[in-house]
Curated annotation (Swiss-Prot):
A GO molecular function held by the record: chitin synthase activity
Ranges of compositional bias, category Polar residues: 74-92
Substitution effect: R995A: Reduces catalytic activity by 87%
Family: Belongs to the chitin synthase family. Class IV subfamily.
Keywords, ordered alphabetically: Cell membrane, Cell wall biogenesis/degradation, Cytoplasmic vesicle, Glycoprotein, Glycosyltransferase, Isopeptide bond, Membrane, Phosphoprotein, Transferase, Transmembrane, Transmembrane helix, Ubl conjugation
Listed name of the protein: Chitin synthase 3
Ranges facing Cytoplasmic side: 1-170, 355-452, 911-1029, 1077-1165
Subunit structure: Homodimer. May form higher order oligomers. Seems to interact with BNI4 and SKT5 which link CHS3 to septins.
Outcome of substituting S999A: Reduces catalytic activity by 59%
Region described as Disordered: 19-53, 74-97
Protein EC: 2.4.1.16
Cross-link (Glycyl lysine isopeptide (Lys-Gly) (interchain with G-Cter in ubiquitin)): K136
Residues modified to Phosphothreonine: T538
Length: 1165
């Protein structure tokens, strides 16, 4: 939704018509009414919100489900999933202002949904929903009723019913594998139909790769030979070697060694023989073309000594002499041995000569013709030497006068094909072509020209992509990167920062420079006895901590005087909008209202940072607006005042989300230490660790949850009293029901890894997926995968955003966040996703958050991942440059266009919701139903979906974000850095890259279908992604072609110069990027190591990955105690949804309040 001034931050992405400005101005309020558009720029078939393939299908469904308490305005493009707003249905893509007691409430205010007389609503917005269908008159079509039916959210529905009709792709899979019927596959270890189909799809995909490879190979090597099929060798004039002699412009092979003592050129059945002295010369006069086109043009004189007959047929025209091929020989009429010696006029010699096949054609270039010392002309492509007319036996023959005229007319270098055009002149020209031809003009056929066109067009495209990527990557490094993050720096300072990161990344144990923490902000030491004391009231807690932490007086700050100059009327601070600034603005207005009624009363400003930590400030309110304030931990990290901006931008609350599986204590400690000690204020960050099952990693003496809980202290609830709660897992069958425990407390440092003076008091929540009682005896109870861990958080954020019913686990998560931070979960705006073996640089989180705050269009970003064990083995050494170039060339290029296609799961940040303008409207991003529903899809019945969802879930999330929000940005921030341990064994690397390569292929296929990415046609990200997809699929063939070209260039002639230059540019520009962007010359060495390993990167790894298309395991990447045993079939059993309780958080809270009241009453009694 646009702001009050009609300025939409997304407008520059939209194709607006001339009337759009007035439309925008008319849509900024609830009462603006339904928009009227004159037309749609989106094709109708792409705007049907009842189509499950529409990127915003689930968003439209969600708004329909929640129409009783959500009110959503149209977007700036007039998008509206249900235009019949007056009948009670909602409008999509916008925001509303919540109504309660005649005042506007907070954004995402979670009010009682069961109250019928007072409607609670949520401010929410989205700019991504496709546009409605409009008829020719501009009227809005009604949304189809089939799409307005609510979805039963107690169970996430399967998105599509099974269809027995075979698709074209399935038919092709069966066709290409007709030779492998089901019984044979079952005999080979694939008894299940789904497994067999995966194998068939793998074979079909490999066949497609082979087709593409064959096309590329044909264009590279076969196309030229097909359309430019000149099988004969071409030799340039004066460069004919001594193994040949030239006869009438053609080169014939001369054998100089078989017959000793030979004195002249002799012709046998298929070979010319002659002495060494004749090699490399012009022997045209030894085999003269007589009595052809020159018959009756060249005639014998009456006293001619040349044998002739009555029909003017002559035996020869010129003396039968050899001459130099460069034309330097002078006429020689001396008779040797006898007249006609060496003229080869016998029938046997002539028949033998006519039977010879020339080995090559002699050619002249136009420059050579014009600049030659010889009198050369051209006729119909033949090069004629007029100087050879001086060799005519003038005493014995008569010839046309035109011969002398041509010779003396200074026609050198001209093409006389059109001049000699009438009948007699053409006969003369053909006669000259027979007797004085010395070669052909260097020319090409139409096929050869077409071949050159294809070659150079391909060359231009490839070089354009490579060079443009290089230039843009350099531009990003010099111009964009230094302006990103918390502060703008010059290139010198940027280099220093990069060097500091390089020094830090040389070893995983190397410590980063940490700031000393104020003693009041350090962790407190508690005895077990002190953990059970009674919670203080919210106001007492605020009063207790307000001055101690930030050294400001206990007196209440009046926002009307202290922030009025900075905080705009819409809740924006210097153009930057956050939940905190908007909440502060609203509470400031409430202060004004309350103070005007009772000057002695003023709402405590500090409460603005607690969101709904107190009951409604409006007297008489009976609605539950927040959780019970008495359960808040007494020593939570106090929220700073609104004007606390240590980095020059409003702070936003961030969840640092860590997923772990089988990591050891050192790896997990490394990650949590680095996150806890980042210089981003601990008041605005929350650590959240998810342990994926009761897993004991290989070599560990404790399970992963035990290790994680050992790093917590000062628990909200004693660990032995925490109960497991149910939730809907991303799985099939009985495993769809899972249980987890939630522990909340504060991070417990190890003084040996982080000195006490550098420790911050950071809240932490650990979620342990423990599984149902039925699976406690299994190998990996509770394990559902990393995607399920992410969905726990994402689904929770969606439920909070849309005020939906939630599971018990999600309510406990909400409750624990409230207890440990004093904040409702809707205050969090970003999520930093980190793997449990990653160490983050201290200022990384600050730079990432700063970029999010400064540009609300950014929905995701990543930093640079460094390898900490560079020289551990040859396996790690070959990865160093690959990591570097993937960031500083690929991601840098994509970042300039806001379309980074892969945000690595080990270190990336996503936006939960984004401010839409500065007037209180928000766009759910990571919490968007279209993201959550598609990412939590549990129906993986095709090879494509299995590779997307089971192997490359992190990359798929990035693709899903771009697919849902193609006009928003995903960027790369090199100022933010982390380091990790790369695989040091080849089998582990092989397993890791198998997953990465296969997920890359399938994700690129998803992205190449997105038509709304930046650019158009060849100048678009869609085209670049298409090129990357083809390039990835033909990597094994490409490296084979490269090796072939290099070997061919070494051993054969002519040298393929263009191909070698192209190869040098492709391999050389990354090296040049290192020289330009890197601050360490050592990367040149790592580049050399990488180039030597190209056969591994481009052949071994992708070939292995393609052959393992149907392998969906994680292989040797993560190992557990006892080995990676196969779990039971994921589809085993049925899902009993009755075991999962779904309620609103208010209903859960009301139940909790009653339970606590009963316990209190029973205790008193």
């Amino acid at each position: 939704m646009t702001g009050l001034n009609g300025d939409d931050p997304d407008d520059y992405y939209l194709n607006l018509n001339q009337d759009e400005e007035s439309l925008l101005r008319s849509r900024h309020s609830v009462g603006s009414g339904a928009p009227h558009r004159q037309g749609s720029l989106v094709r109708p078939e792409r705007s049907r919100l009842n189509n499950p393939d529409n990127p915003h299908f689930y968003y439209a469904q969600k708004t329909q489900e929640q129409m009783n308490h959500l009110d959503v305005l149209p977007s700036s493009t007039g998008v509206n999933p249900n235009a019949t707003r007056r009948s009670g249905s909602l409008r999509s893509k916008g925001s509303v202002r919540s109504k309660f007691s005649g005042r506007e409430t907070d954004s995402y205010l979670l009010q009682d949904m069961n109250t019928t007389d007072k409607k609670a609503s949520v401010k929410i917005s989205d700019e991504g929903v496709a546009e409605d269908e409009f008829d020719k008159d501009g009227d809005v079509d009604n949304f189809e009723e089939s799409s307005t039916q609510p979805i039963n959210k107690s169970i996430k529905p399967l998105r599509k019913e099974t269809n027995d009709t075979l698709s074209f792709w399935q038919m092709y899979c069966y066709f290409i594998t007709f030779w492998a019927p089901a019984p044979i596959l079952a005999f080979c270890g694939m008894p299940k139909k789904e497994r067999q189909m995966a194998w068939r799809e793998k074979v079909a995909l490999i066949s497609v790769i082979l087709y593409i490879g064959a096309i590329v190979a044909f264009l590279t090597f076969g196309f030229t030979k097909t359309v430019c099929s000149s099988s004969k060798l071409r030799l340039k004039n004066n460069e004919v070697s001594t193994e040949f002699v030239v006869i009438n412009g053609k080169a014939y092979e001369l054998d100089t060694s078989s017959r000793s003592g030979i004195q002249d050129v002799e012709v046998d059945s298929d070979t010319l023989y002659g002495p060494w002295s004749d090699a490399g010369k012009d022997a045209s006069f030894l085999f003269q073309n007589v009595n052809g086109n020159c018959h009756n043009l060249i005639t014998p004189k009456s006293n001619s000594s040349i044998p002739h007959d009555d029909d003017n047929n002559l035996a020869w025209y010129f003396p039968c002499k050899l001459k130099n091929q460069d034309g330097s020989s002078k006429p020689n009429f001396t008779v040797e041995n006898y007249a006609g010696w060496n003229c080869h006029t016998s029938k046997e010699d002539r028949d033998a000569f006519y039977g010879l096949k020339s080995k090559a054609d002699v050619y002249f270039t136009w420059d050579g013709i014009k600049n030659s010392s010889r009198n050369l002309i051209v006729y119909n492509g033949d090069v004629l030497d007029l100087d050879l007319l001086d060799w005519l036996e003038k005493d014995d023959v008569d010839y046309p006068v035109v011969f002398d005229d041509l010779k003396t007319s200074n026609l050198q270098g001209y093409d006389l094909s059109l001049v000699l055009s009438n009948g007699h002149e053409r006969k003369i020209a053909r006669c000259l072509s027979e007797i004085i031809k010395v070669g052909e003009v260097d020319s090409k056929t139409v096929g050869c020209i077409a071949s050159d066109v294809v070659l150079y067009v391909s060359l231009v495209f490839i070089l354009s992509v490579v060079i443009i990527k290089f230039i843009i990557a350099c531009y990003f490094r010099w111009t964009v990167a230094r302006k990103q993050g918390a502060y703008i720096v010059d290139n010198k300072t940027m280099d220093k920062h990069t060097n500091d990161i390089e020094d830090w990344s040389n070893n995983i144990q190397t410590k980063a420079p940490l700031k000393e923490v104020d003693p009041h902000l350090r962790p407190k030491k508690y005895s077990k006895k002190s953990l059970g004391h009674k919670r203080a009231s919210t106001f007492d807690l605020l009063k207790k901590h307000s001055s101690k932490m930030f050294q400001f007086n206990e007196s209440v700050i009046d926002l009307d005087t202290s922030m009025s100059s900075s905080l705009q009327s819409s809740g924006s601070y210097r153009g930057m909008t956050t939940m905190t600034t908007q909440n502060a603005w609203k509470l400031s207005n409430e202060n004004k209202a309350v103070h005007s009624r009772n000057p002695s009363t003023l709402l405590p400003t500090s409460s603005m940072f607690w969101n709904k930590a107190t009951s409604s400030p409006v007297p008489g309110s009976s609605l539950i607006q927040s959780l019970d304030s008495t359960i808040i931990h007494p020593d939570i990290v106090q929220q700073p005042p609104l004007d606390f901006m240590p980095y020059g931008f409003p702070l936003i609350h961030t969840i640092c989300f860590v997923t772990c599986y089988s990591e050891d204590e050192e790896g997990l400690r490394t990650t949590l230490d680095s996150l806890s000690t980042t210089d981003y204020p601990n008041s605005h960050k929350l650590l959240m660790v998810v342990c994926d099952g009761l897993i004991k990693g290989s070599g560990n003496d404790k399970t992963t949850p035990e290790i994680a809980l050992g790093m917590m202290d000062d628990f909200v609830t004693p660990p032995d009293e925490v109960k497991p709660y149910s939730y809907v897992a991303v799985a099939s069958g009985s495993k769809r029901h899972n249980m987890a425990k939630i522990y909340a407390g504060f991070y417990k440092y190890d003084d040996s890894t982080i000195p006490p003076e550098n420790q911050q008091r950071v809240p932490i929540i650990t979620i342990v997926k423990c599984g149902t009682p039925a699976e406690q005896g299994a190998a990996k109870p509770g394990n559902r995968g990393k995607r399920d861990s992410q969905i726990i958080l994402m689904s929770f954020l969606e439920k909070i955003t849309f005020d939906e019913r939630m599971t018990q686990l999600e309510f406990q998560l909400l409750k624990n966040i409230w207890q440990i931070t004093g904040l409702m979960a809707d205050f969090y705006e970003t999520v930093l996703m980190v793997d449990a073996d990653t160490k983050v640089f201290p200022d990384a989180l600050t730079h990432m958050v700063a970029e999010m705050v400064k540009d609300p269009l950014i929905m995701g970003l990543c930093g640079e991942t460094k390898i900490a064990n560079k020289a551990q083995s040859w396996v790690t050494a070959i990865q160093v440059f690959e990591y570097y170039i993937s960031h500083h060339q690929a991601k840098a290029f994509e970042s300039v266009f806001g379309s980074v296609t892969c945000l690595p799961g080990c270190f990336s940040m996503y936006r939960i919701k984004s401010p839409k303008g500065s007037d209180g409207y928000w766009v759910p991003v990571l919490a968007n139903p279209d993201i959550v529903e598609r990412y939590s899809d549990n129906v993986t019945n095709t090879l494509h979906k299995k590779n997307l969802l089971l192997l490359g879930e992190d990359r798929f999330l990035s693709s899903l974000m771009l697919k849902t929000f193609p006009k928003r940005k995903q960027v790369f921030v090199p100022k933010a850095a982390c380091k990790t341990i790369a695989p040091d064994k080849f089998k582990v690397l092989l397993s890791q890259r198998r997953r990465w390569i296969n997920s890359t292929v399938h994700n690129l296929f998803e992205l190449v279908l997105i038509r709304d990415l930046c650019g158009t046609f060849c100048f678009s990200m869609q085209f670049v992604i298409g090129i990357e997809l083809i390039g990835t699929m033909v990597l094994p063939l490409a490296i084979c072609f490269t090796i072939y070209v290099i070997i061919f260039a070494i051993v054969s002639k002519p040298t393929p110069v263009i191909t070698l230059v192209l190869l040098a540019i492709i391999l050389g520009l990354p090296g040049l990027i290192v020289v330009i962007t890197a601050t360490r010359w050592s990367y040149l060495w790592w580049m050399c190591v990488y180039i030597c390993a190209l056969p591994i990167w481009n052949f071994v790894l992708p070939s292995y990955a393609y052959w393992k298309f149907d392998d969906f395991s994680w292989g040797d990447t993560r190992t557990i105690a006892g080995g990676n045993k196969k779990a039971q079939d994921e589809n085993e059993g049925e899902f009993d949804h009755s075991k999962i309780k779904m309620r609103t958080w208010r209903e859960f809270e009301r139940e909790d309040i009653l339970n606590r009241k009963e316990e209190s009453d029973s205790f008193v009694a």
